[in-house]
Regions:
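Mature exported/compartmentalized surface modules and terminal targeting/interaction regions
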Residues: 2-107, 116-118, 123-132, 139-260
Length: 260
């Protein structure tokens, strides 16, 4: 039987055609793979969520000793007798080196210890605490310590914005009259930088001094009448004015026009 002889030029042509076809197929597959990978990355990026920031901390993170004390919310140096302790927040007493003449009263803290990070509100001073230390009420002690027995633990804390959704409150001290002015600020989102009063519609402002042992703002002497405008300057520099604030009704918190 005669064999069919194929010329070498045809064999070479078919071999070359096969190589070209394979290269095109491989290149197409690689391109498809990269396109798919790029699309996957875009989809993952679009589906990612960003955690909402609570705002920057208002102090550096402080390391110190955490101790326990039997807090009585309304009778500490901050005298929050008419402002209930915010739900979910522990009462914290601040060491004297961070007391700042009661400026930290009502400040919100994030406190971190062996049990995790939890929130508290400054309601008292702790003269017996070592520098940078804080006293914790029973609830926040058990949270921060991880249910340890009362004692001393290592903690880290920082002042953070409270983010209350309501305006801050002004409350007058027992004994006020048109001849004696004494105002407490409650529920501020951040510590205040200053509190001022105007008795002439804002033409001039009288600075009030915060009393370090009672958390009340008072003028240098005398009273400022029955009503006045009150200007708040927050620690951030934000300012707002509340018109015609009652200065003589005792222990009846009234809302301001805004919050820090």
């Amino acid at each position: 039987m005669n064999s069919i002889r194929i010329p070498m030029k045809f064999i070479f042509f078919f071999f070359l055609l096969n190589m070209i076809t394979s290269a095109i197929t491989t290149s197409s597959g690689v391109a498809h793979h990269h396109a798919g990978t790029a699309r996957s990355k875009v989809r993952r990026g679009n589906c990612s969520t960003r955690k909402r920031s609570a705002g920057p901390p208002l102090s550096e993170t402080i390391s110190g000793k955490g101790t326990h004390w039997n807090a009585n919310w309304g009778t500490g140096n901050c005298v929050f007798s008419k402002w209930p302790k915010p739900r979910g927040y522990g009462a914290v007493a601040m060491s004297s080196n961070h007391w700042k003449e009661a400026q930290v009263c009502g400040a919100c803290l994030e406190v971190t210890g062996p049990g995790g990070t939890f929130k508290g509100v400054v309601s008292d001073q702790c003269p017996s605490c070592k520098d940078d230390g804080i006293d914790l009420d029973t609830d926040i002690w058990y949270q921060v310590s991880g249910n340890k027995d009362f004692g001393i633990i290592e903690v880290k804390w920082k002042i953070v914005p409270c983010e209350w959704s309501t305006p801050l409150l002004f409350m007058n001290k027992i004994g006020v009259s048109q001849y004696f002015t004494s105002i407490q600020v409650q529920g501020a989102n951040t510590p205040l930088k200053s509190l001022e009063v105007s008795t002439n519609g804002g033409s001039s402002w009288i600075p009030l001094k915060l009393q370090g042992n009672s958390n009340y703002y008072q003028p240098n002497g005398g009273g400022l009448g029955a009503k006045a405008d009150v200007r708040v300057t927050c620690s951030s520099g934000k300012q707002f004015v509340t018109k015609d604030v009652d200065l003589t009704t005792v222990e009846s918190p009234k809302p301001g026009s805004a919050n820090c």
